[in-house]
């Protein structure tokens, strides 16, 4: 073989090696971009979802599965738009609102309502984790709350090491809950045909179903994670905006499909185990835990409790992060994360100390949250429809139409709730 041939072969090998390294690095960068949607998605399977989904399934069987499905599809679009706003503009939703609201009073109103929503969310999530510890380990609710407090502070410490370790931990907890509900469906044996019918047949046959639908919407489309998700894209990993958006679509799809599966599985389990066994008034998490054992076995109860712990711990951490983003975005001020953690825990300890019904608090908090959805979605749609802000990445007309439909549904449910609750 001539020297020229040898040199040519050597160059080809070098080029192939460089190409392989380049492809590996590109794949690695794309994998590094995955994760923000998993942080957002954990908010969609918080203990508030457990409470509303269990009550829906036990009271009405599979009838409200279509609400869960459509709420999850709406959430998928909204979370992508939130991510897109942050990626394209480099600013989160709260920062854009601060820049565009007419005066400081409007900014103050938006900041206060967003903080209230974050605290109300954290109340449900924190209490849910505490209840999980109480049920699984047979300790008092206050002891469960103290364990929850310590555990969440420890998880938040990871945030000091950067966003990626936190994404891994929260993503792992999301996957744990999903795996648990695969097992729960195995124990429950839901009726497949009835599930499909419930998913595909929109209907309300009872006024309480509309109340629960608002609760499901409030538990599924979470205002605080709309603010948070738009703030999780500070690192571009050297990729173009188009590449980041493409990767984010995949990230949102996977994370929200997992969250949607969990919500559907909770309703299906409650329908199969409670509704069709004559236990049609299981509205409390504690009752659900106790009732599972004689109906489907101790293992199902323990798994239910563990999923509640994983859900509560991860979602209360996300709630704390969202509160921090809201404060920084609206008033350009922040407090140490651990200080915020202790402030937002206080209402939970008060509720527990007063002996209030925890499930009532969980369900009511989700209904209250539904009133904050429109206040987050409407400006999100306005900003992502703006050519001045988004350029070539502004929403197309179909996304805009879908956004209008979502806002109309939210406002209609809110109006119904106002009439119902004040009647």
Swiss-Prot record:
Any single GO CC term annotated in Swiss-Prot or TrEMBL for this entry: plasma membrane
NCBIfam families in the cross-refs: nramp (TIGR01197), Nramp_1 (NF037982), PRK00701.1 (NF001923)
TM region positions: 31-51, 58-78, 116-136, 137-157, 168-188, 213-233, 254-274, 302-322, 342-362, 363-383, 401-421
Organism whose genome encodes this protein: Vibrio campbellii (strain ATCC BAA-1116)
Record GO biological process: iron ion transmembrane transport
Name of the protein in question: Divalent metal cation transporter MntH
Compartments (UniProt record): Cell inner membrane
One Gene Ontology molecular-function label: cadmium ion transmembrane transporter activity
Family label: Belongs to the NRAMP family.
Protein origin, superkingdom: Bacteria
Summary of the function given for this chain in its UniProt record: H(+)-stimulated, divalent metal cation uptake system.
UniProt cross-references to InterPro entries, sorted A to Z: NRAMP_fam
Main subcellular location of this protein, as a coarse class: membrane
Keyword Amino-acid biosynthesis: no
Membrane topology: Multi-pass membrane protein
């Amino acid at each position: 073989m001539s020297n020229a041939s040898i040199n040519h072969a050597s160059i080809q090998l070098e080029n192939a090696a460089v190409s392989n390294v380049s492809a590996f690095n590109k794949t690695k960068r794309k994998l590094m971009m995955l994760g923000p949607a998993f942080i957002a998605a954990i908010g969609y399977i918080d203990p508030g979802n457990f409470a509303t989904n269990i009550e829906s399934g036990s009271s009405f069987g599979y009838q409200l599965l279509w609400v869960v499905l459509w709420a999850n599809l709406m959430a998928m679009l909204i979370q992508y738009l939130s991510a897109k706003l942050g990626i394209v503009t480099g600013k989160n939703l709260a920062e854009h609102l601060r820049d565009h609201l007419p005066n400081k009073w409007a900014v103050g109103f938006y900041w206060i309502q967003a903080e209230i929503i974050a605290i109300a969310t954290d109340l449900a999530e924190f209490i849910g984790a505490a209840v999980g510890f109480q049920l699984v380990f047979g300790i008092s609710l206050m002891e469960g709350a103290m364990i929850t407090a310590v555990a969440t502070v420890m998880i938040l410490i990871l945030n000091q090491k950067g966003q990626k370790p936190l994404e891994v931990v929260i993503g792992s907890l999301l996957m744990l809950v999903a795996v648990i509900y695969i097992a729960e469906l195995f124990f429950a044996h839901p009726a497949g045909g009835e599930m499909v019918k419930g998913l595909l047949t929109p209907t309300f046959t009872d006024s309480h179903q509309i109340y629960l639908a608002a609760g499901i919407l409030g538990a599924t489309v979470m205002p605080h994670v709309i603010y948070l998700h738009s703030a999780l894209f500070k690192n571009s990993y050297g990729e173009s905006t188009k590449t980041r958006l493409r990767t984010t679509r995949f990230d949102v799809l996977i994370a929200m499909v997992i969250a949607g599966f969990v919500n559907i599985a909770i309703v299906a389990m409650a329908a199969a185990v409670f509704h069709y066994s004559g236990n049609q008034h299981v509205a409390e998490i504690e009752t659900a835990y106790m009732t599972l054992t004689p109906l489907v076995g101790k293992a199902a109860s323990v798994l239910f409790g563990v999923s509640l712990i994983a859900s509560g711990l991860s979602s209360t951490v996300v709630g704390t992060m969202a509160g921090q983003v809201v404060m920084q975005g609206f008033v350009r001020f922040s407090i140490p994360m651990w200080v915020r953690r202790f402030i937002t825990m206080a209402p939970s300890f008060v509720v527990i100390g007063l002996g209030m019904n925890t499930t009532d608090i969980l369900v009511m908090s989700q209904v209250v949250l539904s009133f904050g959805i429109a206040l987050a979605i409407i400006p999100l749609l306005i900003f992502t429809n703006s050519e001045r802000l988004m350029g070539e990445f502004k929403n197309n007309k179909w996304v805009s139409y879908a956004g209008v439909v979502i806002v109309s549904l939210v406002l209609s449910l809110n109006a119904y709730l106002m009439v119902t609750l004040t009647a």
